[in-house]
């Protein structure tokens, strides 16, 4: 069809494509608007042009304009009003324009939720709801939801013979609570609501488990996902082998490897001819691949060591890839994979019915309370607009009313919203009146169940000439950014985005082209700052690796120093209003990050550089001292019999007791509640402390009475006034922010009391629920938009904004894979997937469906993260700075060099799909930039043609660990001495300080001995003593080392963490029979499903070493005497101090605590066995040398174990052994020798 676009006026500043978007009509229109392409201006102009054209006979209330946020809707209405006023100014007698200005306030310019609310208020009777309903906030909705769900589960538990429900509980919950089931129902409810018919989606979810008529996995609806994954990984294995062959073919390369490598490649290439219709054939083909032993090189000096190692490395990578394919997809027989799904069907059916019951109960409860939540709006509007799957009379009226429906940010629409929009637009394809604007490259709200495929489907079916289902118009000119920013973005994303991985091709239509005019200025090149965090590896079992936190600190300092440098050097920024350059200001700079976890470190780094800073953080509110103190006080007012909140209040500035006074109170009544001790102390003691307590108790009683009589806000304000706490925090550092936080607490209590919940008790429970669920409210905002500060925000928060200088931080932060590795997976196409739990055998298996959905979700996550990175880079107007830490730049750059020989512009699919962080993409893309080739001096790099200007800096972490300003400030006294200037040392407190400093405690030795010590700590202490000296006290205790939480245990675990993982597995291994490799692999899988071990821990476990143990004499003895074996035996034992420290003459005892790995307890004797994961092989000349060191290292530990177990059990410890997994070494310890 012809587009009938009127000619563009010669004086028009619009581009041809923009003009086309403004004028196109006669069919549905999709405008694919790239970042900074002026889409909002185009949308507003299109609307105004239609309204001022009197021949079009269009009124503003005949348009439906849908925006993504309320702020966008308000801006849209303002800009349309301004345009109409300008048109009226040029034609003041126009009755039509006067009518449009009058009608503007009645026009449907809003978010889709607001439009749905308008439908419901107007047609409430069609939905059978009370017209006086109140719209509630998400927090109140979640409180009602929790109550309803708890009630539903309680009801189900009370039904007799409810076998299906109890089987579901057993299959999907832990041993201690039904919290997992609670969470699962809630997640399924939310997920189902993104579908136009939630109940139909839940029923379809069950059908995916009906495999009675399916004879092969290849017939499963999600088999294409499996096929795609296998093909991708096979192709990656092939690429690994090609790289290995390339190294073998190099001069001085390991040519003898070629025959073996080429044979490997032939086998892999043969897989491209696979028979995909037969799962059995697939399984056999994969499992029959035979990697022959690689030949031994004679005369190794003839070969380049680097080429040899690289060839081996790539071949090993190919072998590992093929092994992973076999493990992930073919570890179970086909018939078992299908039967697992059929066995799960009853549970899924029960789960589906339970979610439907909850949905009905939840809505009924809201109806009884006269409330609706945001989720209800779309579905109730849909109910009004639909009648037997067709447009209702109401919908048809809207179709007649709206001459055009315009949607902004269309890429973030979900299926429910799409259905609503379809029902209010012209149903005729030939006369479509839907105008959609968006950019699928900026679709970053999949976590809100946005569906970018809706945009992509239209993008692929609509044609630029209008001949398809609609008209497609591409806006690729960018009017926001300098050429340097656009070149950098294009260079990176040409290599990253395609339909296969990113769900869209980054072709010439998608590329950004220059539309803005900036004066030429130097130093605007994109900067890539990489901070090398390389540290020496530690191997001993008891040492901890450096904390992950240091990365954030170093990166934050680097960014702060960069900003300080730009400010001091008056970095030039082009001012569009002044139309000239000016020196950079703090407000010109934004720091973007995927998450705000580094915000505290960033704030600290900015303080050191004296940079005003503001982090747009939505967390940390409840952790602030002033809010935590007030919450504790409110808990005590609600119920004083809560020891921890009461102690917090007493210790706080509100009461001001110290630790000694708290101890005295506890001694007044050693057992029972602390509040009873408080009352007892008050009654039996005459002191200043007792007076404080008496005043507090009286005050507390008054507040408790007030909480019953008055509302919550009155109570809070009364506390502020009576305690002067509000004024007190105002005098502390950051007082303005602290007072804002207390005002926010008052305001939030006021909001809470407007809900259907009331009273102090419920408010306290409400706050506790928020804290448990991690729904922090964020600290109160004290800065305005125009404050001259450096800002930090998430990439999501920055969408739609623009800044002169953008610093993208945290690029090496790992992607959040939590949802993908969750026990249960939800998918819009295939419903629900999880492992199969055999309730009788207590065994957990991954299902074929779970594996497939996991791969699908992983691909979707990768595509989403790629789009998030695109949003980050396109926020910059003039300068883009990319900052990241790397664990070891030399090793990291070698990994990037693997793609340096690629001649195709697009990076290999596996390289992009396996990325773990943004730096994986940026590094692999920029390695082919001429700047990197020059930096690394690597001839193998195949650079890509580009105009991108890139400055690369590699810095070491040591450059940022000591701040120069801090050091200079601390050295001022030394400068005074050098210059013969006086250094003030006189003080009125000098004599008092000297008296304290010279005081000697008579029993000082006791202060250096802990009342409680672990055996491991004692072992460390003694191992630090000189071997020839007498036993002496250590003057410093070892720093307490806490286990890193699982989410901080990255790819490389510390030696301690590896030891913990090995011990955990040894504790769980069955002794009923000698375990096989398959037994251990299945056990590890079960432990992962139960969150006992993580994937990283499991990869660190050496299964062969465990199997070797059970081949050893100790292992065989344990199997033979399995009924006598006890594992992980904890003990506590009081030991005289003099036995530990010979030079200390004290009549004191120390509590020794420890855990024995294993012991065999017979009738009269006990044998101790302790496992060790110390590195032996390759570290010592032989076992004799190692044994001597190990006996010295662990003698104290085993001696104390033996003494404690002997004293506690009354049985003699006949023998004690150390077993070293590395090398299968057994070492007997003589426990009769002294300490």
Curated annotation (Swiss-Prot):
Residues 509-800 form the UvrD-like helicase C-terminal domain. Belongs to the helicase family. AddA subfamily. The keyword ATP-binding applies. Pfam families: PDDEXK_1, UvrD-helicase, UvrD_C. Its EC number is 3.1.-.-, 5.6.2.4. The keyword Transmembrane does not apply. It catalyses: Couples ATP hydrolysis with the unwinding of duplex DNA by translocating in the 3'-5' direction; ATP + H2O = ADP + phosphate + H(+). Residues 12-482 form the UvrD-like helicase ATP-binding domain. Heterodimer of AddA and AddB/RexB. One of its GO terms (biological process) is double-strand break repair via homologous recombination. This is ATP-dependent helicase/nuclease subunit A. Its cofactor is Mg(2+). GO terms for cellular component: cytosol; DNA helicase complex. Keywords: ATP-binding, DNA damage, DNA repair, DNA-binding, Exonuclease, Helicase, Hydrolase, Isomerase, Nuclease, Nucleotide-binding. The heterodimer acts as both an ATP-dependent DNA helicase and an ATP-dependent, dual-direction single-stranded exonuclease. Recognizes the chi site generating a DNA molecule suitable for the initiation of homologous recombination. The AddA nuclease domain is required for chi fragment generation; this subunit has the helicase and 3' -> 5' nuclease activities. NCBIfam families: addA_Gpos. ATP binds at residues 33-40.
């Amino acid at each position: 069809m012809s587009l009938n676009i009127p000619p563009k006026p010669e004086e028009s500043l619009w581009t041809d494509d923009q003009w086309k978007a403004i004028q196109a009509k006669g069919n549905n229109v999709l405008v694919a608007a790239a970042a900074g392409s002026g889409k909002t201006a185009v949308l507003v102009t299109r609307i105004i042009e239609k309204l001022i054209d009197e021949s079009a006979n269009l009124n503003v209330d005949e348009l439906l304009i849908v925006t993504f946020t309320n702020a966008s809707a308000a801006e849209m209405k303002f800009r349309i009003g301004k345009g109409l006023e300008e048109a009226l100014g040029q034609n003041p007698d126009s009755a039509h324009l006067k009518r449009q200005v009058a009608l503007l306030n009645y026009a449907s310019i809003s978010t889709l939720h607001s439009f749905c609310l308008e439908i419901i208020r107007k047609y409430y009777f069609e939905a059978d709801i009370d017209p006086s309903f109140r719209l509630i906030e998400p927090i109140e909705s979640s409180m009602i939801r929790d109550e309803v769900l708890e009630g539903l589960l309680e009801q189900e538990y009370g039904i007799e013979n409810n076998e299906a429900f109890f089987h579901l509980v057993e299959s999907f919950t832990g041993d201690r609570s039904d919290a997992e089931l609670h969470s699962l129902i809630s997640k399924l409810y939310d997920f189902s609501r993104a579908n136009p018919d939630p109940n139909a989606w839940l029923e379809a979810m069950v059908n995916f488990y009906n495999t009675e008529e399916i004879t092969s996995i290849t017939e499963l609806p999600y088999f294409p996902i499996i096929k795609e994954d296998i093909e991708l990984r096979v192709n990656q294995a092939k690429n690994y082998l090609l790289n290995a062959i390339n190294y073998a073919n190099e001069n001085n390369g390991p040519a003898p490897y070629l025959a073996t490598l080429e044979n490997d490649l032939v086998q892999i290439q043969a897989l491209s001819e696979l028979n995909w219709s037969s799962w059995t054939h697939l399984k056999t083909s994969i499992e029959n691949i035979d990697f022959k032993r690689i030949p031994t090189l004679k005369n190794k000096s003839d070969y380049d060591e680097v080429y040899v190692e690289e060839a081996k490395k790539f071949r090993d990578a190919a072998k590992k890839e093929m092994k992973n394919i076999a493990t992930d997809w073919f570890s179970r027989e086909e018939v078992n994979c299908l039967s697992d799904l059929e066995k799960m069907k009853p549970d899924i059916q029960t789960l589906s019915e339970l979610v439907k019951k909850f949905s009905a109960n939840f809505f009924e409860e809201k109806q009884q309370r006269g409330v609706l939540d945001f989720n209800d709006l779309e579905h109730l509007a849909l109910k009004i607009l639909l009648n037997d799957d067709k447009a209702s009379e109401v919908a048809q009226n809207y179709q007649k009313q709206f001459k055009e429906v315009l949607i902004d940010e269309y890429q973030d629409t979900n299926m429910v919203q799409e259905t609503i929009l379809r029902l209010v637009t012209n149903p005729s394809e030939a006369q479509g009146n839907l105008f959609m604007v968006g950019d699928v490259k900026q679709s970053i709200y999949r976590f809100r169940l946005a569906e970018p495929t809706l945009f992509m489907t239209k993008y692929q079916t609509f044609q630029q000439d209008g001949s398809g289902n609609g008209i497609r118009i591409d806006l690729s000119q960018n009017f926001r950014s300098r050429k340097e920013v656009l070149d950098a973005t294009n260079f990176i994303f040409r290599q990253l985005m395609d339909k296969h991985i990113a769900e869209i091709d980054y072709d010439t239509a998608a590329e950004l082209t220059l539309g803005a005019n900036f004066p030429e200025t130097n130093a605007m090149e994109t900067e890539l700052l990489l901070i090398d965090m390389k540290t020496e590896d530690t191997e001993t079992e008891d040492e901890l690796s450096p904390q992950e936190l240091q990365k954030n600190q170093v990166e934050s300092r680097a960014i702060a120093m960069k900003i300080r440098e730009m400010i001091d050097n008056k970095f030039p920024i082009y001012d569009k209003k002044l139309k000239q350059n000016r020196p950079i200001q703090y407000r010109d700079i934004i720091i973007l990050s995927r998450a705000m976890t580094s915000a505290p470190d960033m704030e600290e780094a900015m303080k050191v550089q004296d940079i005003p800073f503001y982090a747009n953080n939505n967390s940390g509110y409840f952790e602030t001292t002033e809010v935590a103190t007030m919450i504790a006080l409110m808990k005590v007012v609600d119920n004083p019999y809560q020891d921890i909140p009461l102690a917090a209040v007493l210790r706080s500035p509100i009461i001001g007791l110290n630790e000694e006074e708290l101890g005295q109170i506890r001694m007044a009544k050693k057992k029972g509640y602390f509040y009873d001790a408080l009352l007892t102390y008050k009654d039996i003691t005459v002191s200043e402390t007792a007076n404080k307590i008496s005043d507090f108790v009286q005050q507390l009683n008054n507040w408790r009475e007030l909480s019953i009589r008055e509302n919550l806000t009155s109570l809070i304000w009364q506390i502020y006034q009576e305690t002067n706490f509000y004024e007190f925090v105002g005098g502390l550092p950051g007082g303005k922010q602290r007072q804002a936080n207390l005002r926010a607490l008052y305001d939030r209590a006021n909001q809470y009391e407007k809900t259907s919940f009331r009273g102090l008790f419920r408010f306290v429970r409400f706050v506790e629920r928020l804290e448990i669920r991690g729904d922090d409210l964020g600290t109160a905002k004290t800065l305005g938009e125009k404050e001259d500060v450096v800002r930090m925000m998430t990439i999501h928060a920055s969408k739609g904004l623009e800044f002169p200088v953008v610093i993208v931080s945290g690029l090496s932060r790992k992607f959040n894979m939590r949802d993908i590795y969750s026990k249960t997976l939800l998918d819009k196409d295939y419903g629900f997937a999880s492992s199969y739990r055999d309730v009788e055998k207590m065994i957990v298996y991954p299902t074929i469906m779970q594996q497939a959905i996991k791969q699908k979700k992983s691909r979707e996550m990768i595509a989403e993260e790629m789009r998030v990175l695109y949003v980050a880079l396109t926020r910059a107007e003039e300068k883009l700075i990319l900052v990241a830490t790397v664990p070891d730049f030399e090793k990291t750059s070698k990994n990037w060099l693997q793609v340096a020989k690629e001649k195709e512009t697009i990076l290999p699919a596996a390289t992009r799909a396996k990325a773990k962080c943004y730096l994986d993409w940026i590094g692999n893309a920029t390695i082919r930039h001429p700047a990197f080739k020059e930096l690394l001096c690597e001839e193998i790099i195949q650079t890509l043609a580009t105009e991108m200007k890139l400055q690369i800096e590699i810095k070491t972490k040591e450059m940022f660990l000591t701040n120069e300003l801090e050091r200079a400030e601390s050295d001022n006294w030394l400068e005074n001495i050098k210059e013969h200037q006086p250094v003030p040392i006189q003080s009125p407190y000098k004599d008092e300080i000297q008296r304290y400093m010279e005081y000697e405690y008579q029993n000082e030795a006791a202060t250096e001995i802990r009342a409680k010590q672990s055996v491991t700590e004692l072992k460390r202490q003694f191992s630090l003593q000189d071997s020839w000296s007498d036993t002496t006290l250590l003057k410093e205790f070892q720093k307490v080392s806490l286990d890193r939480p699982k989410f901080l245990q990255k790819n490389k675990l510390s030696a301690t963490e590896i030891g913990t993982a090995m011990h955990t597995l040894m504790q769980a291994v069955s002794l009923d029979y000698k375990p096989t490799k398959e037994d251990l692999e299945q056990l590890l899988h079960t432990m992962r499903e139960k969150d006992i071990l993580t994937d990283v821990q499991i990869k660190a476990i050496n299964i062969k070493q465990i199997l070797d143990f059970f081949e050893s004499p100790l292992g065989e003895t344990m199997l033979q005497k399995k009924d006598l074996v006890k594992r992980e035996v904890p003990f506590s034992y009081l030991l005289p101090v003099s036995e530990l420290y010979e030079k200390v003459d004290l009549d004191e005892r120390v509590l020794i605590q420890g855990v024995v790995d294993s012991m065999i307890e017979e009738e009269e004797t006990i044998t101790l066995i302790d496992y060790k994961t110390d590195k032996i092989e390759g570290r010592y000349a032989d076992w004799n040398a190692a044994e001597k060191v190990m006996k010295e290292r662990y003698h104290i530990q085993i001696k104390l174990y033996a003494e404690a177990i002997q004293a506690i059990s009354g049985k003699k410890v006949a023998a004690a052994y150390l077993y070293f997994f590395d090398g299968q070494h057994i070492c007997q310890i003589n426990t009769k020798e002294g300490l």
